[in-house]
Amino acid sequence: YEILRCLVGSEMCIRDRNMIACVDSDYDYLLQGATHTSRYIINNKYVFHTYAYAIENYQCYAEALHEVCVMATLNDHPLVDFVAFMRMYSQIAYPLFIWSVWFYRKHNLSEFSLLDFCSYVKLDRVSVYHPERSLESMSRRVRRKLLELERRHPKALEEIEAMKREFAKLGVNEDNTYMFIQGHHIMDSVVMRLLVPVCNVLRRERETEIKELAEHNMQFHNELTSYQRRQLGVDIVLRKHTSYKLSPLYKKLEADIERFLKHI
């Protein structure tokens, strides 16, 4: 099929059975028709969307991150439990994420924009051996902002709770929130900030192992050179792997496409 950006604001309309559009959902899936773009994307049978915010969220699928590190470093030491880490990240971000979408639904981005939200749910310096510390710092920021928003908008609290129930039906929960946060932010300000130091440690481990097993300097240098040539940048692996095809959201998208193909 043809992949293109759906220009909802233009005169282009996708109604031709010979052409479908595949687009990032952004917040449009969660807005559930609160904007013209959202209505167009979720109601047009010729438009398929990612469900996750964007393709980058799939590339950062937690269950795939260990394999990404293995492919990049050729070291399979499970240094960090990525699934548990991203679950904890999601649980911390979740309540503020609900507020972020609420402001979008109210068309009030001057008070709390997407950029504002992302500034609260980023990681600062990450310790490979104590990654939870970066989450503790983020948690403090999020709690302060939540208290501020709750004081400013006490009448919104019932709506916020209703949105949580609504989002659960849409597949969003406290454990997978990272799949619905801006994709570039998750990749650049969360996952890469974790993967880069992890891969650096894994590479040093493998180089130390090569040195310890080498019987002489020439063997060490030859094997070290060979190892260095076979390494890949973790950013490259992250963008090229396809392990996200096992994710529930991807399976949901696959099912949509299969249903569509049966009726053309």
Features from the language model and the residues they span:
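Acidic side chains
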Residues: 2, 24-26, 56
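Single conserved hydrophobic/aromatic residue that forms the stacking wall/gate
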Residues: 2-13
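Generic hydrophobic, helix-prone segments enriched in Leu/Val/Ile
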Residues: 5, 53, 92-96, 250-261
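Acidic beta-strand-to-loop metal/phosphate-binding motif
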Residues: 15-30
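Switch/connector loops and helix/strand junctions flanking conserved nucleotide-binding motifs
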Residues: 28-33, 57-59
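Short, aromatic/basic amphipathic alpha-helical patches
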Residues: 31-41
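Activity-critical C-terminal alpha-helical subdomain
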Residues: 41-219
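Charge-dense, extended regions
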Residues: 196-264
